[in-house]
Amino acid sequence: QTLGVEPEVLVGICVERSVEMVVGLLGILKAGGAYVPLDPSYPNERLGYMLNDAGVKVLLTQNNLLPELPSHAAQIVCLDTDLKIIESHGQENLMTDVGADNLAYVIYTSGSTGQPKGVAIEHRSVVNFLNYMGYVPGLSQEDTFSAITTISFDIAALELYLPLIVGAKVIVTSHKIATDAN
């Protein structure tokens, strides 16, 4: 919030699959913002287009990815090297005016013209989807999810958040392991 993150403010997140990725996503939502998931394996031109098209104000990333990122106007926060600064902020719950009709995230599709197209997803849509999927097929604290999908694909919200809301376990699988055929 000290960086101006509030409802309808878009925050990019371009990180490798890790626990820090989940912390970053939850931090954006908890601050009241909406995230724009950016796969670090995307071509530089595509990432640049998405950052500019979305008007991303803040970009969460990791220090090792900085050389690969296109130039952009967003303020950068590295979840690894800026950890001390992040930890210096209060640990209390943040107050926000986020409602069901506010944006949760903007995900980019390939687009019918070949240019990526942003699709805005509201909190109500995410919550309704997760609540339904929690009941059918039915999940419990005894279940374990393997999150293998890139965060730039919409099913990632199911893989990451559903286990958390039902008290189950989520294992964030690295890109290397998730794509290994063996």
Give the ranges of each region predicted by the language model.
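Short beta-strand element of Class I
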Residues: 170
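Conserved adenylate-forming
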Residues: 147, 179-182
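Carrier-protein-dependent adenylate-forming modules in NRPS/ANL systems
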Residues: 1-127, 131, 135-141, 145, ...
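Charged (Asp/Glu and Lys/Arg) segments that form or flank catalytic channels of large polymer-
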Residues: 159
